[in-house]
């Protein structure tokens, strides 16, 4: 059969931060798939383990000695069975034996090999003929928090989304235009700014949160007027990064201010209303489903309140959030949960409950473009994958190619 696995190969490669990660090749009788795993800087405590204690070098041996022998002879099309075998080999709840990065690289490479065996693109193999919508890109403009230095804003990501774009090409270039405009505005505010960038390609200025918000808003307005494409500001606060559990407050070091949960909710609500935010991710720490629910009840009819660290692509945790009305969107990062099967099941649960799935990169990335295909296959309205940088534009340029391949493609339907 065309898709019977004949070999599984693994190697250590670099990610965008210069750290080691794993890349896997799966070879079938008539196909080939390659995938590399990313890694995050700000991670949820309930994510699966990225690698075992021995790191990437231990994984090389595990794949060559154990995983390869188990998968050879299996049909790559039977992805659910293969993912189950990977979890059985690992034998732990959090994939600490093999590591979620290893499992996701094998899982994605297998799916690619299956698609290749039947001469199909991955988005078509996974999504079928109904996979015709292209996601809007969330672009990272200013980096702060865990993605930047000590003088940067506390808020981790100042994002934009070109909601008025008619196609993905227009969307990608609108984001790039905002990125350039923001540098100009930063340099006008601070002539000493040398153009430093963070892990995800956003600028890293020495600005307060308030000044960064003003620059973000101004750039969106100016580019919207110039291009005739509406661009809306968005945020990822990554609030767990500045939540202090000992004093139970959010510590904003730039302004030397501390906020309790009620003050944090009011602060985020005020930002959403003042700057017409389209999307806000992780506005509260990862253990505060109640706070997420309260904020969603206040602004969820006009702003996406998205959970990343709080859900970690885990459908059982998402189910808890759904029951409480916590958030109305969820970040989808395959390496948080380990397998494509589990990733798909989380997306399915989200869509069934009107939670918007947002397929996302990680801060430590590679030029692997798999998530572009997953976003189209899953029908995700948004993809979060930066605005510039080789490892970021690999996904964006792949979306442009996918759009060309689908003669009846359209931009995804947004919730508002």
Swiss-Prot record:
MF-aspect GO terms: magnesium ion binding; phosphopyruvate hydratase activity
Gene3D superfamilies: Enolase-like C-terminal domain, Enolase-like, N-terminal domain
EC number: 4.2.1.11
UniProt subcellular location: Cytoplasm; Secreted; Cell surface
The keyword Disulfide bond is annotated on this UniProt entry: no
Active site (record annotation): 200 (proton donor), 333 (proton acceptor)
Biological process, per Gene Ontology: glycolytic process
Cofactor binding annotation: Binds a second Mg(2+) ion via substrate during catalysis.
Gene Ontology cellular-component terms listed: cell surface; extracellular region; phosphopyruvate hydratase complex
Pfam families: Enolase_C, Enolase_N
Predominant localisation class: cytoplasm
Pathway(s) this gene product operates in, as recorded in its UniProt entry: Carbohydrate degradation; glycolysis; pyruvate from D-glyceraldehyde 3-phosphate: step 4/5
Binding, Mg(2+): 236, 281, 308
Family: Belongs to the enolase family.
HAMAP family associated with the record: Enolase
Entry function: Catalyzes the reversible conversion of 2-phosphoglycerate (2-PG) into phosphoenolpyruvate (PEP). It is essential for the degradation of carbohydrates via glycolysis.
Protein name: Enolase
Organism: Methanothermobacter thermautotrophicus (strain ATCC 29096 / DSM 1053 / JCM 10044 / NBRC 100330 / Delta H)
Taxonomic lineage: Archaea, Methanobacteriati, Methanobacteriota, Methanomada group, Methanobacteria
